């Protein structure tokens, strides 16, 4: 007799098969712009925690997208399995390839725009160099992960 706990095999890989990144920058008449992109390919993530064990923090906290659209007799085409609570909550956390997500991504890690004032202007103020800039971190991510999870997240 095969026991369910013995009938398992390795699916997916949490370590990316490859990592890539590139930068781009340009400068024109004192204005500058730069950006850095980074990503990984062929990575899987086994989802755990709140997405699998809904309301596992003492049944408190906000209702998230993955708490909704659960299977019910009235919603047989739901995205997620039936939501259970208490002793039956193991139904949600059953080991299954359902909880493995494609975690490859491409992310704009940093974008920056700036302006460097001409040195002849700065000499009048006894300043050697002055540059103003604005920068943003992680403003854009392309991923197939569901539920709004960060594909760089490495915890459970």
Model-derived features with residue positions:
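Conserved small-residue
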Residues: 1-14, 75, 144
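Membrane-embedded beta-strand positions of outer-membrane beta-barrel proteins
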Residues: 35, 132-134
